Amino acid sequence: MIPILDSKRQYATIGSEVEKAVCEVLRSGSYILGPNTKAFEQEMADFYGCKYTVGLNSGTDALHLALRALNIGAGDEVITVAFTFVATTEAIGIVGAKPVFVDIDENTFNLDASKLEAAITPRTKAIIPVHLYGQPCDMDAIMAVAKKHNLHVIEDCCQAVGALYKGKMVGTFGDFGCLSFYPTKNLGGMGDGGLIMTSDEKLRDRVVALRNHGGAVRYHHDEIGVNSRLDEIQAAILRVKLPHIKDWNEARRKHAYYYNELFKDCADIQTPAELDDTYCVYHQYTVKIPNRDEVHKMLQERGIGAMLYYPIPLHLQKVHEYLGVGKGSLPISEKNTEMVISLPMFPELTEEEQRTIASTLIDCIEKSKSKAAV
């Protein structure tokens, strides 16, 4: 079996460091908002070249509290994509706002900035571009529309830690960048975790208060907040991992290019596209293929841990029925959900494993075509 991700292999390379860091936290007696969280926030600010970061309980909370900090709520609209994980729109719903969907670019899987202006109404307050699979969005075009219409921008970077657009870190273009440290992420903890980044001190202070029950001073509460604090153990683990992230991302890129080489003569496999002047960090290596569901089943039977991210676009999910956005309204998103499949991708993946994955995928596609022709 070749899994989609193998966390155990990564742990084997840094396990002693992680265990030492965790034991130091346990011995310290400081488990919430202690020195590791503070140090990690500063290290992430340095890594991103932004003024502030705030550690949180999850990427979902990062999106939620970013919206709260910008006073977005009931009656407001937020433009985003339907081809993403539900947390993006979940956060919009939690604050009482309405998600408005625009379609994606067929090749990059990201928000198509040329379709933004048609979605703007007097109620539009923000845009949430999602840097899906580690691929940066076209931030120049998105920021130009946002500036023209005086809209906030919250970047969903949960799959794109370390990705670059024209040499600048994604997550530092808008009002906020939001990260997830879910264990499967490029920079993953060993539990839940998240973070916002911003260079606006007032926005930072608002999130600091919101994450801790709505108050900056203990037992003094200025508004309804939440309990969304990155705990010390996760912060300590992430501090061990952060110095490795550039090398891990480079390994992912190397694997992606090798996959591209292995698939170059197979017309049935459309490999990922990269925008010019971007640095994709390949959280997923996602291709488009014919007979996707049949091929996926065959791959699983043959021990290849391929996954479908995502099989149903958000506008067609039950949770968003109330929006009245029917089938056919986002044709590219809908088409891609029927064709995309993500192949094993993690830094420790070997070339031998990649060759096995590639040959198996090509064989499964050929077999599925033969079945369809009968």
Where does each model-flagged region fall?
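Conserved active-site segment immediately N-terminal to the catalytic lysine
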Residues: E155-G188, V217-D222
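PLP-dependent aminotransferase-like
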Residues: R68-C157, L164
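N-terminal "arm"/small-domain region of PLP-dependent enzymes with the aminotransferase-like
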Residues: M1-S30, P35
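PLP-dependent aminotransferase class I/II
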Residues: K8, T37-E43, F47-K51, S114, ...
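Phosphate-binding glycine-rich loop
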Residues: S30-E77, E90-V95, F101-D103, K168
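Structural detector of well-ordered beta-strand residues that form the stable sheet scaffold
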Residues: V54, I79, V100, H152-I154, ...
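Conserved G/P- and acidic residue-centered "switch" motifs that form tight phosphate/ATP-binding loops
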Residues: G59, G96, D156, K185-N186, ...
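Short beta-strand-to-turn element immediately C-terminal to the catalytic PLP-Schiff-base lysine
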Residues: L179-S180, G194-S199, R239
